[in-house]
């Protein structure tokens, strides 16, 4: 029980400006009994959208101070959900917050999946069984360092598509998704006696636009789908509230450590007397390929967390546990003045690593950290609650080196092309592909005995280039490259461009134009190249490979290994170059020797006693490759230069 009564504003602490009257307004709405008289049904008849209360919010719905942490169900193996939830409760949390991810639930238009790893309703039920309330953030856009912010790539098959807008094609697709999601989540809302106390509309829209008519339309879509209008709220940075908020919805504040005082003052100025709900308190940060590891000390954050809770604020820690962006789901940032969809390769593109450890209180593999105990002490000092004991950390195993001696070349197992004779290479979206790799081939009509420039106007996002199967170099969007000089070319030679989608941009103005593959027509020596054949290589499910012998270049390597018992381990990819790993059919995600991430998390839940299968696709394969399983993660290796793209510009 909080030391702050829900029905009373606590006195201001000295760290908050004395002239501001802030506080906790948990009783501005009564608990669930007062919410039972929803007007949703009548709204469906009249077409009116039931109003909410700008002085409400999750704490008002819950009738108590909310102490929450973020944990996203697709990033944690389902077998481990309960372990993580128990640890959340043991740290002193009373609520779990999660996004819902449109792209994993609707991989193809109109086809929905809420089973297995995607069973959000079961995730919510398990949280409730562990004594936790739940906040759900359905998006439709979620950011989250997730490919395209959770938007499904098939949206961009419509050449007129404008996401996060009132464009009819977007709103119709979003409504269909929200309808399906609400069937899973709405029965679990507090208004129906369930644990869900908050539903966020959109996500930090103020950092993207200020079309309030769009936000009104999106709110109406939520209500039509069946989400309770009393549970709805928006979230933005403190300086962007005016752009993203709606006048009658509660607002949440998202900000970095050390910013609480200014953020609370901004909220008071924007909406005097409003209850304080911190939607995201960034207790860590994410990492980019080729950059240094990000960490944040927990001592000062624990002190600020205590101050916020003492001031009566409800707080969500982003993240409680980060987990892993398994498969192709890691996204990318596009920072800087050129970050818009018209500048293409000039965008400051920063792809995210596979690990979403986030330096959070609970590590990628669910281990408690010093930050966990610092936050636990801070929370308990305010609530006085007797907390459950901290569950034991999961056991780890090591794996002896696994030789990847036998492989099969990508060139020997290409599928039939999905498009031929194209004047301009189609993007992944154009051919109905979402993730993985895509190959473009054409025969050169003219040769040259002198150096010539191959120009790819926009690479999304990493292109390996070959002439008659011989590697020439790579062009990396991350390095703002567009051009590779070829020493010479023969007439009739086959030019192959193998493009990896290393993650669509998930944040910022570059969002609308995000497509994967090649965008625009390549040129060689100033002449536009045409006659392209396109090969779709989604690698989902993982391909069936016949590994017969040594292999170089883009190769699949297949091997088996034995374990006596299943346990978590970390595959050391230091000897590999760039690619992806599958174990027993599970895509562990991308690796890249530019760092800082060196190990891929292999959950024990993906293993079985006895024989296990590993499949590695390495873009720059060579004989003698091997991997081994370590007992600890290595996420802070020194960044390196990619030698394969060193000659491009």
What are these regions (language model features)?
Residues 81-147, 219-224:
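Aromatic-lined substrate-binding rim segments of carbohydrate-active enzymes
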Residues 37-95, 125:
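N-terminal carbohydrate-binding accessory modules
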Residues 66-77, 102-118, 156-176, 200-211, ...:
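The substrate-binding groove and active-site-proximal loops of carbohydrate-active enzymes
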Residues 170-246:
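Active-site neighborhood of glycoside hydrolase catalytic domains
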Residues 119-136, 159-196:
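An active-site-proximal structural segment forming one wall of the substrate-binding cleft
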Residues 110-116, 129, 140-165, 215-219, ...:
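Aromatic- and acidic-residue-enriched segments that line the glycan-binding/catalytic groove
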Residues 225, 229, 256-363, 367, ...:
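Catalytic-core region of carbohydrate-active enzymes that cleave or remodel glycosidic bonds
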Residues 450-466, 495, 561-584, 591-592, ...:
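Aromatic-lined ligand-binding clefts that engage carbohydrates, nucleic acids, or primary amines
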